[in-house]
C-alpha cells in the first residue's frame, strides 16, 4: 500500500489524484482509494486540513497525489448585501456550522432547518452538489504563518 506522509508545498507533476469530501480531508490517519483504483494510507500531521489542489507525497518522494475536493450536498446562500451576509455568518457561526465564505456567497453542509432559518431573514438558499471548502476554524493546524512581524499567541 502507498503511504502518503506529507503535503508538498512546491508544485510537482502529479502521478495520481484522490477525490475526498471535507470530512475525510480533516483526518490525518485514514485509508483512501485513489482515482486510479489504488489503495493509499494517509499518515499526515494532525490538524492538517487538506484543500482542493494540495499535493501529497510519500517518503520516497516518487509519488505525487493531487487532492480534489469532492462535490457534496451543500446549501448555497447568495446575497449582494454584505450586512445580510454577515448576519447569516453570525447566526450560522453561533451554531458552530462550518462555513465556506466567499464574496456574496456562503456554503454549508445541507441542512433544511438552517435553510429555513436563513429564508426567514429574507435570504435565498439553494441546494447544490459542489465542492465544500470551509474556513479552517477548528480544523486549523496549530502552526501557521503570518505575513507580519507582530508577536502574538493563539
Curated annotation (Swiss-Prot):
Keywords from the named record: Chaperone, Cytoplasm, Nickel, Nickel insertion
UniProt record, GO biological process: protein folding; protein-containing complex assembly; urea metabolic process
One GO CC term on file: cytoplasm
SUPFAM superfamilies linked: Urease metallochaperone UreE, C-terminal domain, Urease metallochaperone UreE, N-terminal domain
Domain of life from the UniProt record: Bacteria
GO function terms (MF aspect): nickel cation binding; unfolded protein binding
Subcellular localization: Cytoplasm
SMART domains per the UniProt record, alphabetical: UreE_N (SM00988)
Physiological role: Involved in urease metallocenter assembly. Binds nickel. Probably functions as a nickel donor during metallocenter assembly.
Family: Belongs to the UreE family.
Protein name per UniProt: Urease accessory protein UreE
Species of origin: Escherichia coli O157:H7
Lineage: Bacteria, Pseudomonadati, Pseudomonadota, Gammaproteobacteria, Enterobacterales
